[in-house]
Amino acid sequence: MSQKIAFITGGNRGLGFQTALELKDAGAKVVIGSRDLAQGERAVAKLCAAGVVAGLLHFDITKAADAQAAYDYFDSRYGRLDILVNNAGIAAGVFPGTGPEHSASEVPSDLLHKVFETNFFAQVALTRALLPLLKKSPAGRIVNLSSILASLTLHADPNSSIYNAKSFAYDASKTALNAFTVHLAWELRDTRVKVNSAHPGWVKTGMGGPQAPMELSEGAKTSAALATLPDDGPTGGFFHLGQPLPW
């Protein structure tokens, strides 16, 4: 088989960048999507210096036209896409916190719409746009970056570690993304495309903060593993470091 082609949104920093590094061992050519062109160029230079075969797509997930542009980019250059990592996303305010931005009863409607637009609607739109190319792959893989905070089962359990860690807009957007994972995996069950959700863990990133217990190298392992699943690997699941999580 020819070299795997991967696309990682938000790949210019944090978990996206680290996932690109992890895919080096899979022999993939990794194209990172970056809203900031200069940051993207610097990230590609670092990836190449580390031995990754890397490319850059100037990409803003919140712009509808960029989904079609991404399709055109991969179709014209490679005719297929093997790996899509839907990594780009935003939080709602500083987390953990107790402000109205975290409250189900008080979160401003414009903030709720903004978080859902980025973390859910834009992910769905991009995946739909690229799906014809993923179906052309002999082993298409879609990884949706979710969070343990998407788990309704754990949020409802007073004994769970996240029972008191609630940020409504962010959590609900990731729960919706998990629903997309389940439904799309079912639709693609008779194809060679696998779809899974990944919880990276609480990682030292711009979103996770310096107090997070996990390093980037560990946080990217779940995404990288799901992006390179064998043919008999799972689909329609929610995982952290190889272990299934409750929905």
Language model feature labels by segment:
Residues 50-52, 73-86, 92, 108:
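A glycine-rich helix->loop->beta "capping" turn
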Residues 90-116, 121, 135-189:
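Catalytic loop of short-chain dehydrogenase/reductase
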Residues 26-42:
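Conserved glycine-rich Rossmann-like NAD(P)H-binding loop of the short-chain dehydrogenase/reductase
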Residues 85, 126-130, 134, 180-181:
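Hydrophobic positions on the long internal alpha-helix
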Residues 37, 58-70:
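The beta1-alpha1 cofactor-binding region of Rossmann-like NAD(H)/NADP(H)-dependent oxidoreductases
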Residues 2-31:
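Canonical Rossmann dinucleotide-binding motif of NAD(H)/NADP(H)-dependent dehydrogenases/reductases
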Residues 175, 190, 197-198, 205, ...:
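C-terminal helical subdomain
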Residues 8-9, 86-87, 141-147, 194-199:
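Structural signature of the Rossmann-like NAD(P)-dependent dehydrogenase/reductase core
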